[in-house]
């Protein structure tokens, strides 16, 4: 069953996605639910499909994805990163094209922690001169 299955791990913010890719007709299953059912927003679905549209393989593979942590945007970004890595395992010649689009690089931005004495990470209490 697992013949010619490709794997990629993607991360974004606090989300982690495990992406399993095998030959098929373009079905994307996320946490045992269809992509249109899992992501209500069209923008999140577009983010997930970006690397596939770039290399024109939207209808060539089926994806079985498990994603944990974070919110909708972070999970979509993690899935995109995982799909990109799985595509590179499948065909290393796609790396240049994917890198040029910016999909290979892990987005290292995370939420900055709240500091003691401040309201948020950087928001300071109101200053009174007198």
From Swiss-Prot:
Listed InterPro entries: Ribosomal_Su5_D2-typ_SF (IPR020568), Ribosomal_uS9 (IPR000754), Ribosomal_uS9_bac/plastid (IPR023035), Ribosomal_uS9_CS (IPR020574), Ribsml_uS5_D2-typ_fold_subgr (IPR014721)
GO-annotated molecular function: RNA binding; structural constituent of ribosome
One GO cellular component term noted in the UniProt record for this chain: cytosolic small ribosomal subunit
Annotated keywords: Ribonucleoprotein, Ribosomal protein
Single biological process term from Gene Ontology: translation
Family: Belongs to the universal ribosomal protein uS9 family.
Protein name, as recorded: Small ribosomal subunit protein uS9
